């Protein structure tokens, strides 16, 4: 627990004869003439955090915010806890282990490297859909997961005994955000007799999901999370808050999925990157916590830091449903009411800007084929896909041409759906859409409909409670009959662990250059993310996932075209089998109860026999195995103790020029490792066969693999290499095309710095610290873009890489770059400040020179310190050694 401040504001709160101390935010606000009720609820939570953990003087920032509805001032945020998943958690624990070694190296106490606040790591990112459409799929996939990841899991188990305040939820339990929502989150925390709002940061961008339960939290990079664990505050500009007023209620066939896709479309257009979004209005009264969580989950997709819902009676009902302790539930209610954190629907809060949405106007929709914000009405999917088809290939593509699949009695063509996945915490946490999908499956079977044979189907819920209520309702059998058998409790298809397709189908796709599709109930559909062979991907509710598995094609308009014929030869349309809200609600009422949650979470930290049998050492410092291809001591601290200086970048080479919306998936892919990639060569050289390559995400504990995987996404397009897809560039020292990794290593060997140019929204997507670590290890000193996504900008700074933006609406196109230029960045020194302007001198091969202004995207003095020390990790280690933290 963090050190407490401003004790004069402590007062007693009695709940069921138990006395708690709380920090009286009403009194503190009154003392500075701040009308607390005019602050958005999310900022009231931050106000309490600053009052409890910081200086009273910093509270004036909130008064300034209310005057201008924004602020340029900094606050220090001290989250109550940290949430991790294994893909981002493994490298974070690797860093902590390396920091212990670094502390020892510079003469400090290694045991100072210990989490000071609770850290929960949920293993959910490693299970893959290898087996599907079978009753034995779950067992087979779990066995495969354990075999592939035993070394990683041993490392995490070592970390659990080596570090204080660190717990691991074993594999096969659930998805971290759903586990957080259903079990870990407290809404109001209490420690040492003091009660305060639950809050967190997580090493996954969808940490935002818990804001639906009124717990303020968002995703950060692993390196920021490490700093937070070790007592370092997260310095942030008090954000603008966009209020979204919700009215009415969902009607007809509209689901929470349709609503979140509408909100994502709306808020992306509004441009809310770096801002809080807060939902309010009478429409909240018709929304369950599950619906709210779906909306909060996709905050990264609409660009916001978080999408917050205040505490109300629905919060209490959800805590009761999920079996939380009665005393805890009463504390939540009494605390919220005492602190003016209880939503009273009076619209008194004031926002930076306001949008309104009538829920009754939401209609059935999907989002795709490449971005979550590209919402398409259900009736327009077929025509919309046909218009998009030409953007996937320069060749003339026909919708009508079909190609035979070897050894099968069917054909496939462009637009056919080859993956239909009920996946992701976004939707599997919501009983209304899960029961809806199961009811649709039941009605489809009763009508004699079947899933098309070329569709790979899967069901991967975010918690064991989902399968429990599906069994309780008797509906699981219908999903099973359609091939939506349980494949695992984890992220699976949503993060690219969709597993291989039928080999004959893969051959047909590759041979004919087909543009086939996936339809999933996930939150991201960036090109190449779901499966390397599905160029088009659409996000949809679980109900529509089942529908598209039945149709097998995007070329069919499901609003007007039949899904098939029943046993009487009569056409069956989607509307004929769509379950009504009344049907769904009845099943939910009869099939879901609190005892399910209590039972399934009673042994959450126990794990399977395989997990329990993993043997680990009891050492406080990790015993690195140099031959390991999973866990390796990273090189970040090789120069720890030596002075780092900020200096101008001279004669740098352009490593790559990228377009808009380059995601962290593009920069550091999480999925499969191509057999022709530099990472594959490294693994092969270490006697790892292709079948055991596993994924990039699973190997994030080994910098050698991850360096080679940086910019290795097969769909990334470097504008220096015309007409070429994948991680290639032109090595200017040799005037030849090479992989980005090989060229970067050549530059480093010759003492040449590298820079990146890019368009808008650079680094959007997952909170993937390797998207910053990788470029740093490749020698990238700066990234110059039109704009950066919030988490990635922070990660770059944390690794000592400078994020810079163009001025005066300039773009890379105005510079007419071809990649052969030499780059100087002038004005970098020990006196730099946040938002400084620097000069960029571009020297062309013909001798021409151009000088432009760039703005440093470093926002706080703390971030300046990270740059001065070389990284946030160096800053933390050196300050811990000197007892400055």
Swiss-Prot record:
The keyword Iron applies. Binds 1 [4Fe-4S] cluster per subunit. Gene3D superfamilies: 6.10.190.10, Aconitase, domain 3, Aconitase, domain 4. Its EC number is 4.2.1.3, 4.2.1.99. Its cofactor is [4Fe-4S] cluster. One of its GO terms (molecular function) is metal ion binding. Pathway: Carbohydrate metabolism; tricarboxylic acid cycle; isocitrate from oxaloacetate: step 2/2; Organic acid metabolism; propanoate degradation. InterPro entries: AcnA_IRP_Swivel, Acnase/IPM_dHydase_lsu_aba_1/3, Acoase/IPM_deHydtase_lsu_aba, Aconitase/3IPM_dehydase_swvl, Aconitase/IRP2, Aconitase_4Fe-4S_BS, Aconitase_4Fe-4S_dom, AconitaseA/IPMdHydase_ssu_swvl. It holds the Pfam family Aconitase_C. GO terms for biological process: propionate metabolic process, methylcitrate cycle; tricarboxylic acid cycle. It comes from the Bacteria. The keyword Aminoacyl-tRNA synthetase does not apply. [4Fe-4S] cluster binds at residues 425, 491, 494. It catalyses: citrate = D-threo-isocitrate; (2S,3R)-3-hydroxybutane-1,2,3-tricarboxylate = 2-methyl-cis-aconitate + H2O. Keywords: 4Fe-4S, Iron, Iron-sulfur, Lyase, Metal-binding, RNA-binding, Tricarboxylic acid cycle. Monomer. Belongs to the aconitase/IPM isomerase family. Involved in the catabolism of short chain fatty acids (SCFA) via the tricarboxylic acid (TCA)(acetyl degradation route) and probably the 2-methylcitrate cycle I (propionate degradation route). Catalyzes the reversible isomerization of citrate to isocitrate via cis-aconitate. Could catalyze the hydration of 2-methyl-cis-aconitate to yield (2R,3S)-2-methylisocitrate. The apo form of AcnA functions as a RNA-binding regulatory protein. This is Aconitate hydratase A. It comes from Rickettsia bellii (strain RML369-C).
């Amino acid at each position: 627990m963090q050190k407490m401040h401003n004790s004069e504001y402590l007062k007693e709160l009695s709940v069921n004869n138990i006395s708690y101390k709380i920090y009286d935010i009403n009194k503190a606000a009154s003392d500075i003439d701040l009308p607390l009720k005019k602050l958005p609820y999310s900022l009231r939570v931050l106000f309490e955090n600053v009052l409890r953990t910081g200086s009273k003087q910093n509270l004036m920032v909130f008064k300034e915010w209310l005057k201008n509805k924004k602020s340029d001032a900094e606050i220090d945020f001290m989250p109550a806890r940290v949430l991790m998943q294994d893909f981002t958690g493994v490298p974070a624990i690797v860093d902590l282990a390396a920091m212990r070694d670094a502390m020892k190296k510079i003469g400090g106490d290694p045991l100072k490297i210990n989490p000071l606040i609770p850290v929960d790591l949920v293993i959910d990112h490693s299970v893959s859909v290898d087996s599907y459409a079978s009753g034995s799929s779950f067992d087979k996939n779990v066995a495969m997961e354990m075999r592939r990841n035993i070394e990683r899991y041993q490392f995490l188990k070592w970390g659990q005994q080596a570090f204080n305040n660190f717990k691991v939820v074993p594999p096969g339990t659930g998805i971290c955000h759903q586990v957080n929502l259903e079990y870990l989150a407290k809404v109001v925390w209490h420690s040492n007799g003091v009660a305060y709002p639950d809050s967190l940061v997580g090493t996954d961008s969808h940490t935002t999901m818990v804001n639906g339960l009124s717990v303020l939290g968002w995703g950060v990079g692993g390196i920021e999370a490490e700093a937070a664990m070790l007592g370092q505050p997260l310095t942030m500009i008090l954000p603008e808050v966009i209020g979204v007023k919700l009215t009415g209620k969902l009607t007809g066939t509209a689901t929470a999925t349709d609503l979140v896709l509408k909100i994502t479309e709306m808020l992306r257009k509004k441009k809310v990157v770096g801002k809080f979004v807060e939902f309010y209005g009478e429409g909240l009264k018709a929304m369950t916590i599950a619906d709210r969580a779906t909306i909060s989950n996709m905050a990264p997709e609409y660009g916001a830091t978080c999408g917050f819902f205040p505490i109300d009676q629905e919060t209490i009902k959800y805590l009761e449903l999920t079996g939380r302790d009665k005393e805890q539930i009463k504390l939540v209610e009494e605390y919220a009411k005492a602190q003016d954190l209880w939503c009273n629907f009076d619209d008194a809060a004031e926002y930076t800007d306001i949008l309104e949405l009538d829920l009754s106007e939401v209609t059935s929709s999907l989002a795709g084929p490449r971005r979550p914000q590209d919402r398409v009405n259900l009736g327009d999917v077929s025509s919309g896909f046909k218009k998009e088809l030409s953007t996937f290939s320069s060749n003339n593509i026909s919708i009508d041409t079909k190609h035979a699949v070897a050894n099968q009695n069917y054909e496939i063509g462009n637009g056919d759906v080859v993956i239909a996945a009920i996946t992701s915490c976004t939707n599997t946490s919501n009983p209304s859409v899960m029961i809806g999908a199961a009811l649709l499956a039941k009605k489809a079977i009763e009508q004699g409909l079947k899933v098309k044979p070329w569709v790979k189907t899967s069901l991967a819920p975010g918690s064991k409670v989902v399968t429990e209520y599906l069994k309780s309702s008797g509906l699981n059998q219908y999903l099973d009959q359609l091939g939506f058998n349980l494949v695992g409790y984890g992220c699976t298809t949503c993060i690219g662990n969709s597993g291989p397709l039928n080999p004959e189908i893969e051959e047909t796709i590759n041979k004919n250059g087909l543009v086939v599709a996936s339809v999933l109930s996930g939150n991201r559909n960036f090109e190449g993310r779901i499966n390397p062979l599905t160029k088009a991907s659409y996000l949809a509710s679980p109900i529509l996932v089942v529908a598209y598995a039945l149709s097998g094609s995007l070329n069919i308009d499901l609003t007007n075209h039949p899904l098939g014929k029943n046993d009487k030869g009569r056409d069956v349309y989607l509307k004929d089998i769509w379950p009504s809200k009344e049907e769904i609600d009845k099943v939910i009422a009869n099939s879901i109860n609190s005892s399910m949650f209590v039972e399934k979470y009673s042994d959450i930290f126990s794990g399977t026999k395989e997990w329990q049998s993993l043997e680990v050492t009891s050492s406080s410092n990790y015993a690195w195995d140099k031959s390991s291809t999973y866990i390796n001591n990273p090189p970040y601290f090789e120069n720890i103790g030596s002075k780092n200086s900020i200096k101008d970048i001279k004669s740098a080479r352009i490593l790559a020029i990228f377009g808009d919306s380059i995601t962290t998936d593009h920069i550091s892919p999480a999925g499969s490792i191509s057999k022709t990639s530099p990472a594959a060569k490294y693994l092969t050289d270490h006697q790892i066969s292709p079948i055991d390559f596993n994924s990039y995400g699973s190997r994030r504990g080994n910098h050698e693999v991850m360096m080679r995987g940086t910019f290795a996404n097969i769909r990334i397009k470097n504008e220096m290499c015309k007409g070429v897809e994948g991680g290639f560039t032109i090595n200017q020292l040799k005037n030849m095309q090479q992989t980005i990794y090989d060229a970067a290593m050549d530059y480093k060997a010759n003492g040449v710095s590298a820079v990146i140019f890019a368009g808008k929204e650079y680094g959007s997507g997952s909170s993937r610290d390797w998207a910053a670590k990788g470029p740093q290890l490749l020698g990238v000193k700066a990234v110059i873009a039109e704009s950066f996504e919030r988490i990635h900008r922070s990660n770059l700074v944390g690794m000592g890489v400078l994020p810079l933006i163009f001025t005066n609406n300039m773009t890379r196109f105005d510079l007419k770059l071809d990649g052969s230029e030499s780059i100087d960045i002038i004005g970098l020194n020990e006196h730099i400040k946040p938002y400084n302007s620097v000069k960029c001198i571009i020297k062309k091969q013909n001798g021409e020179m151009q000088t432009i202004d760039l703005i440093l995207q470093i926002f706080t003095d703390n971030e300046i310190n990270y740059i001065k020390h070389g990284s946030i990790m160096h800053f933390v280690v050196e300050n811990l050694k000197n007892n400055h933290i």
